[in-house]
């Protein structure tokens, strides 16, 4: 693909020397069931997501929305980013005001957040950290907040035309600036997204999202599980041009809504978004059938953080 230059304020990684970030949990998370007692939602809300109630108390900092289908790796991305940011001096903690004070499920999730982030059996944490707002601080000053919520509320492969629940529309329309991190992955790493028609419908859902976004919002495509592709030639040595082309080939017209229509800037910026690749780490199956997590190289979360 010639002269592909996504952009959203920072220099876009069209060459092999720029940023990347992705993940490698493959098929693992498609097998994990979700317990309404531990994932931050009540049984009623699990049955009807339009009943979900949220509060974004801090309107002064951006919301980083992790947007993608089930099993695409959003939760492990949050876990990996939390570990990385804490290792370089940031404070990362759940926002307890995000859910009603009467919600004991969410309170329990907040109480156990540190344990779930730090445990070796990180794959098990994806069963629990399913709906949460996490704030990032530097020396006591809030920087941003990450929103993690179930992928099926963004795009459900078995019901691809489902409307967004009310709470997602509330987030789209609230006054915070948003950074939308849109997840893609190799065609073979998620059985729920393995056929081209489903991926095309996901592209359509992203197009619908784009039509609702404010001009203040930014978009980052996160090509996850990059270690499952042939485009990695070593840490930091990513063939970005081929990685971008692979996303275009696998997700029909996914970039089309972000075409730069400005007659001047489109000459050097074909699209208006950023593109990163990511890998959380490695997952090893143990003798008891569970998966242990080994943290990946800091290159990937570092580059994603630079783009945020």
Task: Describe each region flagged by the PLM.
Residues 1-71:
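Short, flexible boundary segments at extreme N-termini or domain junctions of P-loop NTPases and their
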Residues 68-70, 138, 150-153, 279-282:
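Short, flexible loop/turn elements at secondary-structure junctions
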Residues 3, 170-172, 176-308:
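Conserved GTP-binding G-domain of TRAFAC-class P-loop NTPases and closely related GTPase folds
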Residues 57-58, 137, 213:
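Short, flexible hinge/linker loops that cap or flank conserved catalytic cores
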Residues 61-63, 131, 218, 272:
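Extracellular structured ligand-interaction cores
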Residues 40-124, 141:
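Conserved G1/Walker A P-loop phosphate-binding module
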Residues 126-136, 140-177, 189-199, 203:
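Switch II of P-loop NTPase G domains
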